[in-house]
Amino acid sequence: MNQNRVVPDVTVVVGAYEAMPYLVRCLESVESQTLGPDRIEIVAVNDGSTDGTGEYLEEFAARSKVATRVIHQANSGGPSGPRNVGLRMARGRYVFFLDADDFFGDEALERLVAMADRAGTDVVLGRLKGVGRKVGSSMFARTEERVDVHSSRVVFALSAQKLFRRELLSRLGLEFDETLPTGEDSLFTMEAYLRGNGVSVVADYDCYHLVARDDGKHATRRGSYPPRFQALTALTELIVRLEPPGPKRDQLLVRPFTVGLLQQFGPHLLKESEEVRRHKLELAAPMVRYWSRGVADRIKVGERLVLACVAAGRLDILADVLEFVRTKQVPEVVTGDRRGRIFLAYPHFGDRRSGIPRSAYQVTVPDWSGSRRIMPTVTLPSLARRAVGRARRDLRRLGVRRPRRRRVKLDNG
């Protein structure tokens, strides 16, 4: 084992549980880094494996040119514990959390470190590539030295597989929440985004390969929904705590509502018992306290309507909306509103007794009605509309008429 006394550029933290044979390729990808073995260290935590993972880690550490420390511990029940152990032992300027099932592209760390050094940012995202699975791509449209967390798509990339500046993590005392059985990486990454000195994106190279295991291990069971609500509520409360009220907070809150809560109330809810439906509604209550018009107007009508039903506690209307979606019906486009607004007539549109506001059906972001693209109309803000209305009424009371429009011929001579 090469124990390099020089401070490495990167500490790669590998938490490993029943990781064979995927661990072999994972560690080989660290050895293959163009950054060079003298600039990398590995801290590998064997989390109570019984499949030979621990033995392979020791064998690797004994022969590898990359300085490697191996820790063996009893199974902790999740990824947070091993990651925290590795983070506490890290010596590198940067830390990268590499899952034992996955692997790096050869140039990944060299490119990520170069970006962080050049831009001075505390978090760097490297482009993901799925192996036997789909991965998000919208946040990797282009390489950028600095992105705005509030307006960019990086807020939809909250997994832990990123380069983090260790000084930031140490200063904040930032660790993974070991009380959360799922979603712990979302809180960790979001806090680093919001409290760090900027976020960069490396989008021109496949830095990280996310692997779908053939044996299906490590997959979260669909039925275990209470922990998901716990994680979503924690993420929502973190955003509210760190971001003051206003448009920026509203934009951030779109993430837990659409990538999280919405999935718990999808069409599959129709197959679940009344008891489960009501239980989910109860679990959503702490989170929907932060549902607001500012958040709602940033979401498409179909998704917003589901969330509005949850916020209003209307499981009956929600069932009608989900059946409408499940059967692939197309909402009618309703125009002619005196304010120029456009609506999509999903179930219960125009029903004043429903408790669902008419605004829930309004097109406020680019949307779809079947194959037809629907663009929102641009209207004056409510305060401006009121001011214009008052001014017009005052003019009418004074007997002032609006001037007629006249065509004026310009003399170009």
Predicted segments — roles?
Residues 26, 30, 60, 383-386, ...:
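Low-complexity, intrinsically disordered/propeptide-like segments
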Residues 1-234, 350, 354-356, 360-370, ...:
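Nucleotide-sugar donor-binding/catalytic module of glycosyltransferases
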Residues 211-397, 404-413:
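C-terminal subregions of glycosyltransferases and related glycan-biosynthesis enzymes
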Residues 66, 77, 156, 379-380, ...:
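A general, composition-driven signal for non-globular sequence regions
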